Amino acid sequence: MEQFYYILKYLILGLFQGLTEPIPISSSGHLVLAQHLLGLKIEGFSFELLVNSASLLAVLLIYRNDLIRLTKNGLSYIFTRAEDAKSDFFFIIYLVIATIPAGVIGVLFKDYIDQYLKGVKMVGISLLITAVGLWIIRNLRGRRNDGDLSMKDAIIVGLAQACALIPGISRSGATIVAAMLLGMKQETALRFSFLLYIPVSLGGLLLSITDIAKDPNLDTLFVPYIVAFIATFIMTYISLKWFMNIMAKGNLKYFSFYCIIVGVLTLIFL
């Protein structure tokens, strides 16, 4: 019976992670709220690594063609200086640059964030901040595409991503808001945001992979972890595909409304 409880518990959290990771409502914030509301407590740091890895796998699957093209053209530009591969080469460079702020800030301030910025009230405040950002860009229609990006754009979007280390600040929301305020087209902002998710997640996974082996709960939670991984992967794939359709229709304001409602309810009742 206890094993069934653990499986159900991690299934719920995995579905939460998968649903909220791609869309701009903060997966980390919703995991904090889910644990609080359902009386759940995650045993061990491995769970966070596990579900992030599952979401990463789903993003890799969806953007596989972009990744293949970027890799091919990036190498082509390095060895042949082919002009038609130049924009993809620099797109990769800008992704690397945009990864740095979150990596540096995460390493330097991880303990502070864990101790002071992961409370339920902080999640409520951060969700309201996310809502404001999404509302501001609700009607923006940029003109800049992949080939128009610059180092300044990469740094600004990277700093926006670093803000999402705070639960309640959506990573996809923060990066898309920053990108669209810089004049990027919606599809360019979306692609840059989720391709940027890949190196950040890989970096975090590689830096913390030993924590999985050291997790004292791994033996008892192996099956629940696998259930959570599968649930997160499937839900992330579905959720990201759905979000891409929402972006194409310009309906980001609904996510703003949602974040306002959840943020206010969190501050009032939790």
Curated annotation (Swiss-Prot):
Q: Where in the cell is it found?
A: Cell membrane
Q: List the disulfide bonds.
A: none
Q: Name one GO molecular function term.
A: undecaprenyl-diphosphatase activity
The EC category is: hydrolase
Could you list this entry's UniProt keywords, alphabetically sorted. Answer: Antibiotic resistance, Cell membrane, Cell shape, Cell wall biogenesis/degradation, Hydrolase, Membrane, Peptidoglycan synthesis, Transmembrane, Transmembrane helix
Listed under GO cellular component are: plasma membrane
Q: Which branch of life, at top level?
A: Bacteria
Q: Give membrane topology per the record.
A: Multi-pass membrane protein
Which residues span the membrane?
5-25, 42-62, 89-109, 117-137, 192-212, 220-240, 250-270
Q: Which reaction does it catalyse?
A: di-trans,octa-cis-undecaprenyl diphosphate + H2O = di-trans,octa-cis-undecaprenyl phosphate + phosphate + H(+)
Query: Which segments of the protein form a coiled coil according to its record?
Result: none
For biological process, the GO terms are:
cell wall organization; peptidoglycan biosynthetic process; regulation of cell shape; response to antibiotic
EC number(s) in its UniProt entry? 3.6.1.27
PANTHER family found in the cross-reference section: UNDECAPRENYL-DIPHOSPHATASE
Q: Which family does it belong to?
A: Belongs to the UppP family.
Mention any additional remark: Bacitracin is thought to be involved in the inhibition of peptidoglycan synthesis by sequestering undecaprenyl diphosphate, thereby reducing the pool of lipid carrier available.
**Main role?**
Catalyzes the dephosphorylation of undecaprenyl diphosphate (UPP). Confers resistance to bacitracin.
Name under which the protein is recorded: Undecaprenyl-diphosphatase 3
